[in-house]
């Protein structure tokens, strides 16, 4: 008989289910287990088609209306539960069929202890779904979301009884009890130590004493291993084995019976032979009242197939998890003797219709910005999303309003439309903490656009899209670097219409400071519009206002890819190419402002540097990443920008001239980055090859991201 509680339920449950110690050790060391324990999605299951446009949001707060009152529902768990829920189903569903949902019929009889949240008392789990029972027993409050079994909300069993030998004794009256204490004594938690605070809340005073006539307690003290430190499995195994070897004589003295290793292996082999292969046929959906919504979910999982394999279900499961309309899905399956397949029971929690996002960027540079987003979602046979957001700050401000409709047809597709108002003030972003920007550019860009887009998925990580946009941009700038208070800026207005078709592929693990996956795109745009230039006081005298029509094609291609050579070292490669037949605008600076730019690092997005803008260019570089910890790394990045037919301010009237390829410009970044779970915390030194200030120091928390432009 095996009895476990808290994290120990994973080990005890897997052993009882027919997993050998070597198999469990390999499992705990695997990449899959890392993803299960952190809630992050593996690259192979990141479904890009459903991803919304990127924003600098930190946390999502759901809003619910109850009793005519609005109620804010902040996140209740740090680690998303979908990975863990699917893992337990994948590992233990066939075991349930083999033991017929009776834990006494496992390879070794087993039960575990959870905590009933509402009754604050132990819940003994001896039958039912083994994966759900283990999931309940190890659900540490605040880290994982509680699980409901038979109408009872359950948490970590260690909350009320972290060493349930008394339950074992009263219920089963065993001849000998062998216990293993791995819980360290409580340490005083610091005010800012959330992990320590949670550990102390969970670890209540526990009686670990067993009468010497009734059994033995092994004790392993883990000085440097804390709650959920799964990455330290090697140390845990080493220390645990050492404790067992030191106690083996005492254990042998208590137990006279001997079983050979071969006998245990044969018993495990016979039990595992009872496990049917995982194929799924019937699907039931719980938690969704609307029949059209249930049909939407079932069709997303099965499509037109009658039976699906585990691999097919896993891929479609994570596609649904990526759907903004669904908050969580807990998969439970039961073996159907009549069909020979498993029936899927999906406990679905729809996303609340109303959601508020909070985020932005806080830094030592005056690019601080706040962000608030609002989403309203609903779905039946189709999925509907209404989205708006607002950015506010000295450097960048914006407002966006739009909607998206998803059609779950055989080839899914979406239609979306957005109206956006953008404003950048590059002069306001130019002051520095350590390196003075002696000649900051006075550039203010106001841009508004209305975009319509449609697209469909191309495999898991890609989508094909096409769209149109109406855009109006107004750039204000000076023609010289030295200006007087009375000077008036030049103003260039460009009213345009554009069409685009493109392919995007994205499997990156983070929206900024990524270290895994790839991002690629190629797009072709046709842009037509009217440029109006109104000279200011720094233009050459007698410069008239001008109107010019522009019609041109713009081809853009980009690739970023990371190669994980070891657990410590990753190499990233980035390349970008832009080609167009766009004519120059009325003067040098307006030409640069209307040209595409190269922004390979977050900080580069906050500056306007003329050297890195051109109508045609090639650019690329490398990114070396040294992982100090899974979420903490050192990054060294270097890039080169090669303009083609570069505009140069060589003529007296500031009109551009061209050279095919003559110059190249360098930029780079050295940074320490820690991914906190809500946003990146970074300390960086940035270099740009340009006149005057070339080094920029930045301490930043959050994201430097903007709403999209029209072209």
Set out the residue ranges of the language-model regions.
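A glycine-rich phosphate-binding loop feature that marks nucleotide/adenosyl-phosphate handling sites
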Residues: 257-267, 469-470, 521-523, 575-578
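Gram-negative/organellar outer-membrane beta-barrel architecture
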Residues: 311-312, 316, 322, 328-508, ...
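Flexible glycine-/small-residue-rich
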Residues: 114-117, 220, 285-289, 348-352, ...
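Short glycine-rich, acidic/polar surface loops and turns
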Residues: 164-165, 197-211, 621-623, 657-659, ...
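Patatin-like phospholipase
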Residues: 1-5, 13-329, 333-335, 340, ...
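Extended beta-strand-rich architecture
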Residues: 498-504, 508, 515-653, 659-670
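Short, glycine/acidic-rich beta->alpha junctions
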Residues: 157-161, 198-199, 394-395, 446, ...
